Amino acid sequence: MSECMVCDRIELTKAGKNPYFVRELETGYVVIGDYQRFYGYTVFICKQHASELFQLENDFKMKYLEEMSLVAECVYKAFPCDKIHYELLGVGSGVHMHWHIFPRREGDSPVKGPVWKVPKEEMYSEKYKPTTEQLEEMKEILGKELDKVFN
């Protein structure tokens, strides 16, 4: 285990041991979020260990942003929603750049605003952890949309 939990996830993915992995792209990895409080929640992890966009070489940065936008479009089509929320956060052992892509639907949370207004105990409740079957179905649905754009 490294000091970066995101790098650890990348290593799991490379070893074929990340059940949430959907697709490798030129600049990053598409993975289904561990918890699905917002159905279709997806993460796009940067292949380069950097915490800020300005730390990336310009051509890579522009390609990463383009791919993130295309992944978000695929999420939108795979998991119909009213709006996509994009968030590039990071703190502690999770500063390695990764986009949180949240499909949002009218009335999907008790308060309007970012998903982080939902209490942590609800956001990360075991009831929102997809079963193996649900996860495989989500990966297949998103994979089909990614195929249309990236193949």
Predicted segments with their positions:
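HIT superfamily nucleotide-processing domains
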Residues: 1-151
